[in-house]
Amino acid sequence: MAPKKKVAGLIKLQIVAGQANPAPPVGPALGQHGVNIMEFCKAYNAATESQRGTVIPVEITVYEDRSFTFALKTPPAAKLLLKAAGVAKGSAEPHKTKVAKVTWDQVREIAETKKTDLNANDIDAAAKIIAGTARSMGITVE
């Protein structure tokens, strides 16, 4: 077995799927670790081609020899909730002004999508996490 590569850094970014380019925030974040920026952009865009337009968080592991690997995460719960509710943004005063309503079924569906990234043991616990996010955005869960 080949010797393990030493990890030089871990970079977490949220980039719109299929639209990674060397401009900020991608370029500077990768540049300071010495990663080939264009190589990452091409690989990321190819991997996220099917989800164009959605924000996809990515965790990039940079090794000492300047090579890298990346893991794609599920879209942020807030973005999924906004899409489900059909609104552009959450409430400025979430506990005073409510901007939209989502059903428990929609919340469970989002929890199913996010379950790999959530720190929950079952779907009910994951749904409660998503419902909490909705509440803090001024979205009512019914």
UniProtKB/Swiss-Prot annotation:
GO terms for biological process: translation. SMART domains: RL11. Keywords: Methylation, Ribonucleoprotein, Ribosomal protein, RNA-binding, rRNA-binding. GO terms for molecular function: large ribosomal subunit rRNA binding; structural constituent of ribosome. Gene3D superfamilies: Ribosomal protein L11, C-terminal domain, Ribosomal protein L11/L12, N-terminal domain. GO terms for cellular component: cytosolic large ribosomal subunit. It holds the Pfam family Ribosomal_L11. The lineage of its organism: Bacteria, Bacillati, Actinomycetota, Actinomycetes, Mycobacteriales. This is Large ribosomal subunit protein uL11. CDD domains: Ribosomal_L11. Belongs to the universal ribosomal protein uL11 family. Part of the ribosomal stalk of the 50S ribosomal subunit. Interacts with L10 and the large rRNA to form the base of the stalk. L10 forms an elongated spine to which L12 dimers bind in a sequential fashion forming a multimeric L10(L12)X complex. One or more lysine residues are methylated. Forms part of the ribosomal stalk which helps the ribosome interact with GTP-bound translation factors. It comes from the Bacteria.
